[in-house]
Amino acid sequence: MSAISLIQPDRDLFSWPQYWAACFGPAPFLPMSRDEMDQLGWDSCDIILVTGDAYVDHPSFGMAICGRMLEAQGFRVGIIAQPDWNSKDDFMRLGKPNLFFGVTAGNMDSMINRYTADRKLRHDDAYTPDNVAGKRPDRATLVYTQRCKEAWKDVPVILGGIEASLRRTAHYDYWSDTVRRSVLVDSKADMLMFGNGERPLVEVAHRLAMGETIDQIRDVRNTAIMVKEALPGWSGVDSTRLDTPGKIDPIPHPYGEDLPCADNKPVAPKKQEAKAITVQPPRPKPWEKTYILLPSFEKVKGDKVLYAHASRILHHETNPGCARALMQKHGDRYVWINPPAIPLSTEEMDSVFALPYQRVPHPAYGNARIPAYEMIRFSINIMRGCFGGCSFCSITEHEGRIIQSRSEDSIINEIEAIRDTVPGFTGVISDLGGPTANMYMLRCKSPRAEQTCRRLSCVYPDICPHMDTDHTPTINLYRRARELKGIKKILIASGVRYDIAVEDPRYIKELASHHVGGYLKIAPEHTEEGPLSKMMKPGMGSYDRFKELFDLYSKQAGKEQYLIPYFISAHPGTRDEDMVNLALWLKRHRFRLDQVQNFYPSPLANSTTMYYTGKNPLGKIGYKSEDVVVPKGDRQRRLHKALLRYHDPANWPLIRQALEAMGKKHLIGGRRECLVPAPTIEEMREARRQNRNTRPALTKHTPVEHQRQGLAANKKRGKGAGR
């Protein structure tokens, strides 16, 4: 039995009294048109949610969870999905909301959804009917907010979703290669909710319904607002400079009064009298009612070291048990970021996932296929959060480090609901997982450590001794799910954290024996210590141990099964030599990767800070602190990606050039230890032909034809004058 957590909410998520509109009951689907509102008997919506995704009434889609959550509180909720952003008209289709607009770009960041890691345009969108691209604008959060404000200037707009969440402070923007302001500043929205939004969304909705204005709601966890000064009653720590944090407000006397200096005069003894016994209130924790003043937007935009410093502070203030508020100046105002919300309890998670989802797309889409839905329609989310803390991943900053798990009964009920109600179900559950497959019910065994810890990862460089690695709850869940009538197979498609799995070989045996469909995805990400240390990923020893156990248990089960490793190229900290060593490892182990991924600098990730600043925010930041090697430039990024696909003939010329430049010509040839073959005679002839046909690139300083003729004439005249 795990110890009771010290991180507890002020009230249960479902303890608020229902709003009066609860009398209408739940809608079959949240309405997307006035006709649907009329059929429900609504004259207006209390809350309208605007999203960049198609509306799928499924708990894997953020707007469905938010909408059904608010509906359960008694509010009438409408959805405007993928509106035409070229005018305000589409944003007015449901009328004026009584309380607020909720705006999100969708389940994905709109820029990542639209562009590849090499900034090339994508031609599909998995969250749109029939996979059609172009149904949402770039920086959708900004555009949607502006249109909502145009439509109804006096209606509050609240931002949410992954795009807004990861842009709550000044941040590096990979697509424009510059530091941008907080999205709250640029959008002119009234409030931003970061991370999972159930707690702040419900509280703000009820407080608005009870008559408070959006400007009066300033103290809700998981929200960011604009302020002119720090909130009353909060004391601040000035961290606008490197390594010189200091108090902004005077430190109060510990006994509540200022004692006068001694004057050396004799003091007559006082007659002692009986005093009433008073009970002192508990002393406040050092992080309570405390904020950190970050370097301003203007400072971090002009100073990369200060940017890394601000990023380091933000990542250390993500534990809801001890996080302090953050404050960052933008012009003449400040972005105020309240501490993260308290994680949902198992009972609250069960209630959220038990809401009346239809588990299918809205009927307005007809027979259109939505790829993102097709991928998850037979999968089940069993938990939230991740304590891995990988530098390139933003799950910790969005969902938190504390695992929020559903109960076994709740998950079993959902499996049965899929079996009985979802069209096309054939008896195979495609995934039981979440951000990670095997963190279900795992948590810190020490309540005190859980409340006060500021580690970025619970498993790097080694697994924390406080961390529970007993997979018994997961094993029991798998076994119970397999026994359900009508269930032929339970697959695990989420990534397995193999360094935790090897701590409990029973889990690997259960996985290999029953839950792998031939291939299992895992993500070592690299083989070399340089990039692994910047990613905060374990070394290959854990991978080798996992593979040994996986192969053993697969053989015992009479199954031929394989691991599919995933790797990232061009991650900060990666030298060309590191990628060559990774390519040689792949060749030795006979891996030929089809899909490879260059590092994608997404907002707020620690790896993105390394990419932009060349500094390592995982350690102490200073102007002379550790510099990080960063693969930049199209050619180097193409090379790193090409080395992951060393077997592709199209990549051989680039790899050969790089190996020659590194002094590694011995890796070119037909021997077993070589990485790529030597060029054929035909390839060398083709290379010479291409070199002959190439011309220098023209620039604005290159003379055009008539200028060349003029220059030639001048040279002749000059020669004649010299005779």
From Swiss-Prot:
Residues 686-723 are annotated as: Disordered. InterPro entries: Elp3/MiaA/NifB-like_rSAM, Methylthiotransferase_CS, rSAM, rSAM_horseshoe, UPF0313, UPF0313_C, UPF0313_N. PROSITE patterns: RADICAL_SAM. The keyword Ubl conjugation does not apply. Keywords: 4Fe-4S, Iron, Iron-sulfur, Metal-binding, S-adenosyl-L-methionine. GO terms for molecular function: 4 iron, 4 sulfur cluster binding; catalytic activity; iron ion binding. [4Fe-4S] cluster binds at C386, C390, C393. Residues 372-650 form the Radical SAM core domain. Binds 1 [4Fe-4S] cluster. The cluster is coordinated with 3 cysteines and an exchangeable S-adenosyl-L-methionine. Its cofactor is [4Fe-4S] cluster. Residues 714-723 have a biased composition (Basic residues). PANTHER family: UPF0313 PROTEIN YGIQ (PTHR32331:SF0). Belongs to the UPF0313 family. This is UPF0313 protein YgiQ. It comes from Salmonella typhimurium (strain LT2 / SGSC1412 / ATCC 700720).
